[in-house]
A protein has these predicted regions:
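Non-catalytic alpha-helical coupling and interface elements of nucleotide-dependent molecular machines
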Residues: 51, 61-69, 100-102, 134, ...
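Short alpha-helical segments and helix-capping/turn motifs at coil-helix boundaries
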Residues: 76-81, 145-153, 249
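Residues at beta-strand starts and edge strands
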Residues: 12-13, 32, 87-93, 121-125, ...
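Conserved P-loop NTP-binding catalytic core
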Residues: 1, 57-119
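Electropositive, glycine-dotted interaction segments
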Residues: 92-94, 98-207, 211
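Extended helical coiled-coil dimerization/tether regions that scaffold
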Residues: 1-11, 175-179, 185-301, 322
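Switch/communication elements of ASCE P-loop NTPase nucleotide-binding domains
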Residues: 1-65, 259, 263-332
Length: 332
């Protein structure tokens, strides 16, 4: 972003990634084992199997985390291991974010570096991730600014860096089904529409429904007869003269539990795998739409071929390119 020109049409992007002793990328004489420059819009990683495409996505996930709040931690397999030797005890990932708008820069102002150019002041954010082993434990840290003397990044700024991640899809129907910790509930819980977890309109709807259910068992209905029978049975084998005040109550309501009861279904009966995969992707991309907080708009898509057949891939790529043109989303 060149503030001197007042450019606000661009959005911040991941412009460079450097990895040191991460997975198969060995650092030599302090130089990164892999260095990639990214650009705006769609960035395609092309290579043979085991060439490191997944490592690039995983490196970005370790640094940025994801909007659906997946559990992301370094593991033993992340440390470079020479053939026949012990694995390294440390790996590092450096990431440069550039092209800030003023709305975005205000959220990171204490962390930004700047460079005076002929077109104005260019701001960048330098992220330095490090993981290391001590015995059997693995520790990690993320710092910003100077590589040797950086500072920790605070909670809000950290949240604004999270990426949208489409993982390799194996079973779209299961991913979109209801259940504890379901994918669709994770997506909805992290959407701005559900930011208020305690006083949401959905909670009011369920409170009203629960009140009507409880009233069913105390009004002039079959439900009242059921409750009276339970009380009568209890009184008959309780201490003599002890009245029963048993009640039928609904459970406490939490937004998370409500959203976990939802499933996302295709309108067709017995839809094909491609239709389900597109439905899954459409739901995942929900988290890219909001731009009110001035956060990073980045989608990480792994193994597109695992999601769709070739024609559907082309349609999705065309959509993603249009999405960038309209909303300045970066896709890797």
């Amino acid at each position: 972003c060149k503030f001197a020109t007042g450019s606000e049409g661009e959005k911040m992007i991941i412009s460079e990634l450097r990895v040191y002793d991460f997975r198969q990328f060995k650092s030599v004489d302090g130089a990164p084992g892999l260095k990639i420059t990214f650009h705006k819009g769609l960035n395609a990683l092309i290579g043979e199997n085991d060439s490191g495409k997944t490592a690039v996505i995983d490196a970005l996930k370790l640094v940025l985390l994801t909007q659906s709040n997946e559990y992301i931690r370094p593991s033993d397999e992340d440390f470079y291991k020479p053939v026949g030797e012990d694995a390294c005890s440390e790996f590092k990932i450096d990431c440069t974010i550039s092209d800030f708008t003023q709305n975005e820069a205000k959220n990171f102002i204490e962390y930004l570096s700047f460079n005076q150019t002929e077109n104005g002041i260019e701001y960048t954010l330098e992220l330095h991730y490090r993981a290391w082993k001590e015995g059997h434990k693995i520790y990690q840290e993320l710092r910003v600014g100077d590589i040797d003397d950086g500072i920790s990044i605070d909670g809000k700024a950290r949240e604004l860096l999270k990426a949208v991640y489409l993982k390799p899809l194996r079973d779209a129907e299961r991913e979109m089904s209801s259940g504890r910790g379901s994918r669709i509930s994770q997506i909805l819980l992290n959407h701005p529409a559900f930011k208020d977890k305690k006083e949401h309109a959905v909670l009011d709807i369920f409170r009203d429904a629960n009140k009507r259910i409880e009233d069913y068992f105390i009004g002039d209905t079959d439900g009242k007869h059921i409750l009276q029978t339970i009380r009568s049975n209890l009184e008959s084998f309780s201490d003599k003269g002890q009245a029963s005040n048993a009640e039928l109550k609904t459970s406490d309501i939490q937004l998370k539990a409500i959203l976990e009861s939802l499933s996302l279904n295709a309108p067709e009966i017995n839809p094909g795998l491609g239709e389900l995969n597109l439905l899954f992707i459409a739901a995942e991309l929900l988290l890219l739409k909001d731009d009110t907080d001035g956060g990073l708009k980045l989608a990480l898509i792994e193994e597109l071929e695992a999601h769709l057949h070739p024609q559907a891939q082309l349609r999705l790529i065309s959509y993603l390119q249009n999405e960038y043109n309209e909303n300045d989303v970066q896709i890797i």
